Curated annotation (Swiss-Prot):
Gene3D superfamilies: Hut operon regulatory protein HutP. It comes from Bacillus cereus. Signal peptide: none annotated. This is Hut operon positive regulatory protein. One of its GO terms (biological process) is L-histidine metabolic process.
């Protein structure tokens, strides 16, 4: 049940989100793990969530026909957005926009098989007034 030292899923997601396109992450992805990265910018939080969900589905990080996987990913994305927006996910209503790089990682960070697979979402970028 202990977290494996080389299998820190949140850290892996952050490294992937921080890496440029031409960089590879410092750590290699553990065998059997899935991930995707991308960029999203919008004044609409629904578009941010939709772009990240679409990336995860098109890169086979989650299965498109399994509701539980989509639901788990949605909650992980919302938690990450809460962090970036400091608890207020409103963007357009308060004239804020985001430009973000994201990483979504799915894997088994724990030794025990009973713990199952986990998903981590990391966001990195800017939040501020829209540029006109």
């Amino acid at each position: 049940m202990l977290l494996q030292g080389t299998h820190r899923i949140g850290r892996m997601a952050m490294l992937l989100a921080l890496a440029d396109e031409n960089e590879s992450p410092v750590l290699s992805i553990p065998k059997g793990w899935k991930y995707c990265t991308g960029k999203v910018g919008s004044m609409n939080s629904q578009k941010v969530v939709a772009a990240m969900e679409t990336a995860a589905k098109s890169n086979q990080v989650i299965e498109t026909d399994v509701y539980r996987e989509t639901h788990a990913l949605y909650h992980a994305i919302m938690e990450a957005l809460y962090g970036v927006t400091r608890g207020q996910i409103q963007l357009a209503d308060v004239l804020r926009t985001v430009g973000l790089r994201f990483a979504i990682v799915r894997g088994t960070p724990y030794d025990g098989k009973k713990e199952g697979e986990w998903v981590a979402v990391a966001l990195y970028g800017t939040i501020g007034a829209p540029v006109k």
